[in-house]
């Protein structure tokens, strides 16, 4: 009974509630707030629990359809709407699994938005992650307007390494050898391994 009550408490973690983000910085701050809540309960939640908590946060913070289109490259134009939806969901699920794996516990880390600047395709939000040992890591978020809010369309580590470009390079060989269905299966397998869950709608 105690185990059930404890599990119920974790399933009802209090995440910050945000209105439609008025700026790119608001979106990134909302992501950071949710990451910190998950990290502080990370060991108790476990990998699959962190994934369950973060998946909806990733869904509302990232433009996974745009990231999928750019990551898949020219193959995208030949996909049906159903395939586009499926690969977007599998990429979002894989991203959620990666975040659940990387942000697994809290040891005094800080996640800070440091500013934003307009760019041709939207705005770039500047941030830094202060590791437990005090080492800073610069992370920039490319933001695109989506309706009344802003979504993350790419992430740059140390202002240089594009997540979308990295994924496109990783996906190219899979697409060449196994096609889009092979890529979707590979992404879901990787997420399964990281989280101990089974693929379902993202």
Across the structure, where does each feature detected by a protein language model lie?
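Bacterial N-terminal signal peptides
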Residues: 3-12
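N-terminal signal peptide c-region/cleavage motif recognized by signal peptidases
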Residues: 14-16
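Early exported N-terminus immediately downstream of N-terminal targeting peptides
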Residues: 21-99
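Surface-exposed, polar/charged faces of alpha-helical domains
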Residues: 22-23, 37, 41-45, 49, ...
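Short beta-strand edge/turn micro-motifs at domain boundaries
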Residues: 136-166
């Amino acid at each position: 009974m105690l185990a059930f009550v404890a599990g119920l408490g974790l399933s009802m973690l209090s995440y910050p509630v945000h209105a439609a983000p008025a700026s790119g910085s608001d979106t990134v701050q909302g992501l950071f707030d949710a990451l910190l809540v998950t990290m502080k309960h990370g060991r108790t939640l476990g990998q699959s629990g962190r994934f369950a908590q973060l998946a909806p946060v990733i869904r509302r913070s990232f433009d996974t359809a745009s990231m999928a289109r750019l990551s898949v490259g020219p193959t995208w134009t030949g996909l049906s709407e159903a395939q586009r939806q499926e690969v977007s969901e599998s990429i979002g699920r894989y991203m959620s699994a990666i975040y659940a794996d990387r942000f697994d516990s809290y040891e005094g880390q800080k996640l800070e938005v440091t500013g934003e600047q307009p760019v041709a395709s939207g705005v770039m939000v500047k941030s830094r992650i202060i590791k437990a040992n005090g080492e800073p890591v610069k992370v920039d978020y490319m933001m695109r307007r989506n309706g009344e809010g802003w979504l993350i369309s790419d992430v740059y580590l140390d202002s240089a390494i594009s997540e979308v470009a990295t994924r496109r390079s990783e996906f190219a060989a899979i697409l060449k050898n196994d096609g889009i269905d092979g890529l979707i299966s590979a992404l879901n397998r990787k997420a399964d391994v990281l989280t101990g869950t089974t693929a379902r709608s993202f």
